[in-house]
Amino acid sequence: MSNSSPKEQNAAADLQSFRNGEPSLTYTSNHDNDDADESAIIDDDEDEEAHQQEGNTQNQGEQSPVRQQQDTASLDSFSSQPSLFVRFIRSTFGFRKTTLTLAVVLSYLFVILVNAAFEKQSLVIESPEPAILTKAWTDLQVISKDIHPFDSKANDEVHDYILERTRSIAATKPYIEARGDNSTVMFNQPDLFNSSSSTNRIIYFESTNVLVRVKGTDPSLEALLISAHYDSVSTSYGTTDDGMGIASMLGILEHLADKKTERPKRDIIFNFNNHEEIGLLGASVFFEHPWSDKVKYFVNLEGTGTGGRAVLFRATDTGIISHYSNVRSPFANSFLQQAFNGGMIHSETDYRVYAEHGLRGVDIAFYRPRSLYHTRRDSIKGANRESLWHMESNALDLVLDLGYNSIDEDLSPSIFFDVLGQQFVYFSLDNLYILNISLLVLIPVLSIVLLLIVKKRHTWHIYSTRGWLRFPITTVFSITFVTLVGRFFLFHDAMIISRNWFTPLIALTSLFLIVSYIGLNFANWVVPIHDQKLAILLELNSLLWIATLWATVEIKRYSNVGNYAITIYYILASLSSLFGLLALALKPRQRIELPEDLDEEGDNTRGVQQRLKEAALKSFSYDWSIQFLLLVPIWLLVTYSFGGLGLEAINQTIQESNALGEISFKFLGAVAVLLGLSVLPFVHKLNAALTVLLAVTCAISSFATLVGPVFDYQHPLKLRFVQQVTRAGETQVKVFGKHGFIEPVINDLPSVKQLKRNYTCTELSDGNGQCVYDGQRPWLVDGSAVQNEFENLLTVKVLSDTNTGKTRYVPFDSDLEIKAVQSRHCLLLFNTTTFHSGNGVDKYKNAPVKQVSLYHKLQNNTRPEMKDNFALSFVPSGHSVDENGTDIYRLNQGIDEFLVDKTEWNQDTFHVGIEWLYDWSEESDGDKRDRNLGVTVRCYYGEYDAVSVIDGEAKRKIPALDELLQYAPVDVEISNLDRGLAYLEQYVEL
């Protein structure tokens, strides 16, 4: 128990409170000079309130002359007035609220403006305009003149144009050759969008690719493939998807054929492929061509948006990605590759086919805005030369670097990103793993060493249990508020992020900073500690150490290429915190003497303490500015760069499923937190005026997010259309989209209102819905109205069937003749009582169909004779061709679907053989029909932007779609739902 008087206790308490504040001078009492426990630190991080008190201390308390003389003598080394210049430097660059606030505001503005400026700069076309760009733009105009899906006459016209262009270019050089490809392929294609699906879809496809080979000077080198597809979907002109890729390839070919261009060292093969949109088939059939045998590397050009910059978002390995560092305007990020791999983006490109065939290469694509992708807004009107040149010039630089140089054999996965479109950074995942391990060990060791030095020298007075919980508690509260508000946005209207991700990002970032400011400022006021920013930096560094450890495990287990930013954050926080510790470790210890008696009454004690504060204010340190510059600007730049890129890529995926919407909002919240996290070490020193501004910004941004239109012309709602024609003459229109948004569009259609047509809407899984109504009948082929009746467009005949119900343990053989007038592709689906294609009653049961055949030669309208009834025993697994030219595919696991694509318009008939086994273990005692095989034949038509001549009168092919396009609101766009825009379906039982 203390024997001191209350006044002594008050003075000691005041002194202790002062010691635990933010002093920077070491002081000791004359009463006990050698007692280390009496030392304390006066922090450089002075409060502005102390500045205000500086002018008042002259008049504060009339002390006795003797006492005043003692105080002055003890502090005379610190009482000299600094020069005007020194005071200017201190007021401008000291750790003051105004200075810090200005630095924070400038950092955020810098990051936003510099990103926009450099993006604009990267789209500038050099002057004069390159000749290959001028020609490529003309090519693009011709290619995207009409909507040209695979099953359209316009598709043939595009094919002929590309073939003519390439042949004319090839004619200028003896080592360039161009040809049309007529290869065929029959293969098993898994579900492209669901890796867990066990569906086996057998596809027969006839190629209409256009191939060009530029022979290199060294035939021993493996060839480079450059690829893009020239077909569009049925509802789009395909200007960006993928006309720009085709036009870029033609421009590159023009450059290679130029008389000033040297012949490349390795062969460069161009694959202008067809039918990518419905199954990546043009890339798949390429491997049936002999030129594919020599190909080892590839560059795939795609378009999943409608302009902007073309991003390199996937690469197979470090060796191949290293060559991208030589392009003139790099734009790439492996974060998108991880998002693609993780299912955040539901699309696929030919990259997948080439990579699965063991090729090494990259995927370059346009990526925004996704809501215009596959709609008629993807047209030449919405395109520009700048976007075309960005893809063409970068692809040209990459192709030249790969074609003229040796290629690194580093096959390890790579992380990569660009810096403002000026520099390209890449390194292997193995090297990142090593770097992370090194940092996880080195940084803690350095921190501990410096902390021990600081503790020994008593230059940082902070208790082991005091002040260390404010950062985690405040951060948890801030993240909780951000999460709650983000969830409120989501539940209020999940579609708001589809139109605009920037406004809610501003709202959530402002909210995070406000809550953090309140929490940390309150903690600093209640329990002030010496150098709070350093304490928070160390805690932030510890948090990032854990995150880096997790990211390192992800690298080892899953080859995750998207978490590289965590390593950057850890490095930045480490540099900033280590610098703070180093500054304390090297700081000289200055001592002042306190009077021996702290128990005198009156204002003497208060005067001494006030003079101590004045002295502290005159010992300035500017290490905060270095810490700020090491941490905040680069952190914000990294976060905004990959965060903005990611949000632009995924924000409109909410229209595809609620699950993707959840991911989008979570990612939005994560970016908002990351944008605020780097400022937390300094946030308690922000000017209160800025917090008011942040509150206003948060309120305005939230209001704009909640009350603004969900969709607009630039960010429309996307609905998907298909029309089914039934044998009974029904013409059902199916419109698919987000549940609740379809009905208003259908309600306003003239045919629905005038004819009082009923429609039914069904809520499907994952927030989607489908509405069905009777639409205007389609006119699919030229001729008479009778020729457009169902029975004259699609007929399915059973030519033979061995399922008599008597044989049990041998395969059944059935032959079908399918006549589909002017349809280029038909899909066969199979079902029994226990199995249905795509929706098996028992998901563990194999499909009954074991073999499908496509006959090209017939004998008396029947297939050629087989050796005996045990056909399955004589056919190898997989694809084979018999002596009659019949394509056969056998799969013992069972075949779920069979898709037949053809290229000849006049070849209306498909002849298909099916061999199947009934599962007799499930034999029913009921009707014989329980042992039958059901076959659904569905044939598609994709042309709509054309007319059919019906009995001498021109009629639009699919008027129901025309009506929907014409009367849908300006903020609604229409895309295709299925393989075509209309289909006919017939069911037979074997």
Swiss-Prot record:
It comes from Komagataella phaffii (strain GS115 / ATCC 20864) (Yeast). Keywords: Glycoprotein, Hydrolase, Membrane, Metal-binding, Metalloprotease, Protease, Transmembrane, Transmembrane helix, Vacuole, Zinc. Zn(2+) 2 binds at D241, E277, H374. Its cofactor is Zn(2+). The active site is at E276 (proton acceptor). This is Vacuolar membrane protease. Residues 119-433, 492-501, 556-565, 647-662, 712-990 are vacuolar. Zn(2+) 1 binds at H229, D241, E302. InterPro entries: Fxna-like_M28_dom, M28_fam, Peptidase_M28, PFF1_C, PFF1_TM. Residues 1-75 are annotated as: Disordered. Belongs to the peptidase M28 family. It is found in: Vacuole membrane. It comes from the Eukaryota. It is an enzyme of class 3 (hydrolase). Its main location: membrane.
